[in-house]
Amino acid sequence: MIIMLFKKLSDVSEAEMQRLISRGSGLADVGDTVSAVLSDVRMKGDAALREYTKKFDKVELANFEVSEEEFEKALSEIGSELLGHLRIAAENIRAFHRAQMPETTWFMELQPGVVLGQKATPLESVGAYAPGGRASYPSTVLMTVIPARVAGVEQVIVCTPPRADGSVHPLTLAAAKVAGADKVFKLGGVQAIGAMAYGTETVPRVDKIVGPGNVFVTSAKMQVRDIAEIDFPAGPSEVLIIADESADAAMAASDIIAQAEHDPNAVSVLVTTSETLAEEVEQEVLAQAESTARSEIVKISLENAAVLIADSLDQCIDFSNKFAPEHLEIMVEDSDFVLDRIKNAGSIFIGNYAPVPVGDYASGTNHVLPTAGYAKIYSGLNINHFLKYSSIQKISKSGLESLKETVIALAEEEGLKAHADSIRARFGYRPSK
């Protein structure tokens, strides 16, 4: 029996609301386990990788790096049609992220003799994590590697878990080729994050690690961020749908099921101003859950789901901003009214014909997004995650002279006389010996 929360939003208890808002907060529960694995990888390198790959993936590997022969075999196995679809998705992702690219270097004249600017520089190396396990995720390879390449990152590697026979799914390898990854390693879980953060005999250390994963992977990313920068916490998938009476119940239900099939911990919520729609969606969800291919996972996941009835669109929007969803679908007649008031969302999908899966695969927007409420403080993966910025100042003597008194006054007020003297030195001052 599927137990899904179905209530008027105003009747949701404080405990129920807290469960919805603070979803996915299991990092502390696995922290010690993750820390131990990371420590082993840091100290033992490849030996630890072999140990944990055998323990968790149930496979012994002679080599972690995918060979050129394995890439060629993968490309021959998937066929030209599927490869063509990968290339379509890749080109859309590439085009969208190219549009995000800032001007590499720009300048402005603040005042005569004072020219300020900014220079964007790509990171030197990035490691992309692509989950495995229940399914292969070649789309994640595209979403992580392509923006890094567009940004101009010099070295991009991928880590993804091996299958039981020690291979990587051919579609994942094909995606790595299409996206332009330099190397792919058969490594998953915490040990993969540790390898990319610390470096081993085989796996190069990277400047930044990006990509989603389970609670163990997310915890590992959080723990290594003093060594390698990360994108953001990206855990079990989630969707929030804001709908009114104009929405299609079957479509909304199918989007709830689509999220639920990701993971038993996935979260799907509908908040609507229409009680009729709420009832129809609930019935559709229960029916579709029985017939969908991954029914067992879906039914477990739906225990985290909710159908909520709001008094107004304003109440829907207020709930959404508190929930801060990874994916937000807006299925209302006046979508602009809602969009203008949304503050916190990883990626937004507007209309009955913009379901989350189109963004997951091929529209071009990025599907690596903050979850568990982190959309309040993080943006989804974008070109800026692969760039760093240096400010520039070009100042002439006359320009410095116009700022001289201000700088000297502020420096001396802070008790930093040498700062003030460095300004005076440009105008003939020499400190006494």
Curated annotation (Swiss-Prot):
Q: What does the cofactor section's free text say about binding?
A: Binds 1 zinc ion per subunit.
**Cofactor(s) this protein requires:** Zn(2+)
Catalysed conversion reaction = L-histidinol + 2 NAD(+) + H2O = L-histidine + 2 NADH + 3 H(+)
Cellular component per GO?
cytoplasm
The entry's keywords: Amino-acid biosynthesis, Histidine biosynthesis, Metal-binding, NAD, Oxidoreductase, Zinc
Per the UniProt record, which EC number(s) apply here? 1.1.1.23
Superkingdom of origin organism = Archaea
UniProt cross-references to InterPro entries, sorted A to Z: Ald_DH/histidinol_DH, Histidinol_DH_CS, Histidinol_DH_monofunct, Hstdl_DH
Per UniProt, Zn(2+) binds at Q259, H262, D360, H419
Residues bound to substrate? S237, Q259, H262, H327, D360, E414, H419
Q: Matching PROSITE patterns, A to Z?
A: HISOL_DEHYDROGENASE
Question: Which catalytic residues are annotated?
Answer: E326, H327
The record describes the protein's role as: Catalyzes the sequential NAD-dependent oxidations of L-histidinol to L-histidinaldehyde and then to L-histidine.
- Which family does this protein fall into? Belongs to the histidinol dehydrogenase family.
Q: Which PANTHER family match?
A: HISTIDINE BIOSYNTHESIS TRIFUNCTIONAL PROTEIN, HISTIDINOL DEHYDROGENASE HDH
Protein name, per record: Histidinol dehydrogenase
